[in-house]
Regions:
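Short, amphipathic alpha-helical segments that act as regulatory/interfacial helices
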Residues: 20-23, 27-30, 34, 38, ...
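Conserved hydrophobic/aromatic pocket- or pore-lining residues that grip, position, or stack substrates
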Residues: 55, 62, 89-90, 113
Length: 210
């Protein structure tokens, strides 16, 4: 079977990704300045504080652009509403998902998406043995993987499906970070499921992607 013809991403996706990446860059820059502020001499503190204030204004402005951009495009707007239905998924995560992997047709299933993000588990091997703890592969999009960490922590408290999974893993004696990794993967399955099926999250209706 011949592979399908390559088609460029829609302009609205490329523009959204640029806006999201710009926010990420400015947030990182602001954090660097905040770190400097803690150790800088008094003579430069005012300048750093002014720069932090400027960066905050820029970040807020671009975030507003992102919201408006999504609202201006029906497909993005509809996907945003679906993602908002998942407990633990907030605005920052939604923006990142829509910008980087909102098109589920690129991935055959949620496991493929997990591998793309670098959160699929793998066994650590020693010589010819594959015994050992399962850990995240750490191969994939580092920024996307980091962006799923905090939502997973929130979901461990408020998302009924992930809370139940956490309880079972805890009772089985699994370590905390393994449970967090499992929560991140489950979040990806939920995200993939609602987008693929075009149905909002419903804990009482277990889709096969959950």
């Amino acid at each position: 079977m011949k592979p399908g013809l390559w088609t460029p991403e829609p302009k609205e996706i490329r523009e959204l990704r640029s806006l999201v990446r710009r926010v990420d860059a400015l947030v990182e820059m602001r954090q660097q300045e905040s770190n400097r502020l803690e150790v800088s001499d008094k003579v430069v503190k005012k300048g750093i504080e002014d720069h932090i204030e400027y960066l905050t204004i820029q970040i807020d402005s671009i975030k507003s652009q992102i919201s408006q951009h999504i609202d201006n495009h029906p497909e993005l707007r509809d996907k945003k509403k679906l993602l908002e239905s998942i407990p633990g998924v907030g605005e920052a995560t939604i923006n990142l998902v829509l910008a980087h992997f909102g098109d589920t047709e690129k991935f055959h299933n949620a496991k493929r998406l997990s591998s793309f993000l670098g959160i699929a588990p793998r066994e650590y091997s020693s010589g010819h043995s594959v015994r050992g703890r399962r850990r995240m592969s750490k191969v994939g999009k580092t920024s996307l993987r980091k962006a799923l960490f905090m939502p997973a922590l929130v979901a461990l408290r408020y998302n009924p499906i992930i809370v139940d999974m956490s309880r079972r893993l805890t009772e089985a004696g699994k370590p905390k970070m393994l449970i967090v990794g499992a929560a991140m993967r489950k979040m990806v399955h939920l995200i993939y499921g609602v987008l693929k099926n075009k149905m909002p999250f419903d804990p009482n209706y277990s889709l096969k992607y959950y």
